[in-house]
């Protein structure tokens, strides 16, 4: 998306999609809308902007679930937890979502941002502790922390994630307030400025990589 005018994506990997792909954040919220990993094969995934169970996070969620559009002032008042600036789902695409919806403003324009170097698990633990009002994560990160969300803090789920001590479901407490554009999976791309950028070269590269994928070495 950042360089769509300069490069042509000629192949992209696919992944198992989710049961939900709505761009309306309210459609992701509540136990009845719990996301399942049973969607069709897709070439992209999304990043979601989540309001946490903090008092202010609940205010933001209530507005979105009532069909209201959040203002920049609403978002700027919140404390955000974001990933490294190189993270597609944890920084880049949420920043692009802000740019598209709030007159070009970015994460770096927000007043209260907490950078996290230790991954999404830390973001969810901050959310559970109500230390922040908004976190950003791939769709749907709640699947991966559903079990640990309601475990006592001295226990771990079967994957080793530490319990976060909440009493209500993560689907009820972590509400989506923003949905980004799709983020490509791994791609093969060619520069439109290259002297080799021709339909023939594009077709040859596509055939070449598809053939490689069909070999045992390519699947390794």
What are these regions (language model features)?
Residues 208-220:
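Periplasmic-binding protein-like
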Residues 5-7, 14-16, 52-56, 85, ...:
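Solvent-exposed coil/turn segments that connect beta secondary-structure elements
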Residues 64, 68, 76-198:
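Pocket-lining segment of extracytoplasmic ligand-binding domains
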Residues 196-208:
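Short amphipathic alpha-helical coupling segments at ligand-binding clamshell hinges
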Residues 24-89, 96-99:
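A conserved helix-loop-strand patch within extracytoplasmic ligand-binding domains
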Residues 2-5, 19-20, 40-44, 73-75, ...:
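Extracellular/periplasmic catalytic domains that process cell-envelope and extracellular macromolecules
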Residues 1-28, 122, 142-148:
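Pocket-flanking alpha-helical
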